[in-house]
Amino acid sequence: MYRWLLISLFACIALLILGAIGITELLSGAAPTAVSTLSTGFPAEPVQIPGIRGNAADDDSPVHGWLARGTRGGGMVLLVHSIRSNRVEMLSRARFLNGHGYGVLLIDLQAHGETPGTRITFGARESKNVEASLAFLHDNFPSEKIGAIGVSLGAAAIVLARPAFRLSAVILESMHPTIEEAVENRLRLHLGEFGPALSPVLLSLLSYRLGISPAELNPISRISDLNAPLLLISGTDDRHTKVAETERLFEAARQPKEIWIVPGGGHFNMHAYAGREYEDRILDFLDRHMREHENQRGIAQHRTEEQFFR
């Protein structure tokens, strides 16, 4: 009888480990998409940005993206998508920002879209993509103020990046404070209240697979290094990143900072959900910090003929 109990116990443990391995593959496996073949109707040019050499062999692979030029003095905004997505996710934001004179750069993070990569690393290698993209904007548009908007993984990559210059404005949407909470929330959501019990095994496997300590993937440990005006956005119904977690991030960030908790918002495209209010809040924040010389938000209408760097 004891023999069968031991066999059953080992079988259960083996199933748990196999399940954790499967989830690890699901979470960290690459998500390539032939983005350039899509018809977007958006006047952007394809760009390949030289990567920054890191610890992994593919860290210096070029970052693929779309660049849409704005009006001179209007500012440039980097747009960074969420996990298992690509630059197309940020198109609606790019359209309204570009319509108000902002230049925009939409990128595919490594192992997403058309940017090469073997595994998603939850901000570690992705932060190098952000650094390379910000350097590209700084080098090519030296007279422009530069801001960044990131969603979920994209937000974490912005926080974990170490750009060589100060950003003028940063907007972070639906960002987890720690990788542990991100994993536990998702396990609870999909496997019920006992799901988080798998978290230690899953995090250990991820750490082994990626060669990265989980402690390196905690935005809350680095958000105070973000020396830029900050707007944090989250939804009241977000079960992936809870309101209390966003409030902790807000407390850890340095001034100047603002927070917008969207009633009814979940872990999805906040622009699609909040629509005009989202656009008004984003433009108000960016205009205040990237266009102090402007008395009103009329730059797109007044400078439509003054497209720069043609």
Model regions and ranges:
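Catalytic histidine neighborhood in serine/cysteine hydrolases
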Residues: 250-268
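Conserved alpha/beta-hydrolase
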Residues: 94-116
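Hydrolase active-site cap/lid region
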Residues: 160-212, 221, 228, 261
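An N-terminal hydrophobic leader/cap segment in hydrolases
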Residues: 2-55, 66
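Short beta-strand/loop motif that positions the catalytic acidic residue
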Residues: 225-227, 232-234, 238
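Alpha/beta-hydrolase active-site loop
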Residues: 89, 120-141
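Catalytic histidine-centered segment of alpha/beta-hydrolase-like enzymes
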Residues: 265-279
